[in-house]
Amino acid sequence: FFSMIPKIATGIASLVKDL
């Protein structure tokens, strides 16, 4: 589970940049 956190965090960060 914790190994997926970096990928999710990166995905959220990229979405925030688009806003």
UniProtKB/Swiss-Prot annotation:
Broad class of where this protein is predominantly found: secreted
Descriptive protein name: Phylloseptin-3.2TR
Residues bearing PTM Leucine amide: L19
Tissue specificity as recorded in UniProt: Expressed by the skin glands.
Annotated organism of origin: Phyllomedusa trinitatis
Annotated localization: Secreted
Record carries keyword Acyltransferase: no
Family: Belongs to the frog skin active peptide (FSAP) family. Phylloseptin subfamily.
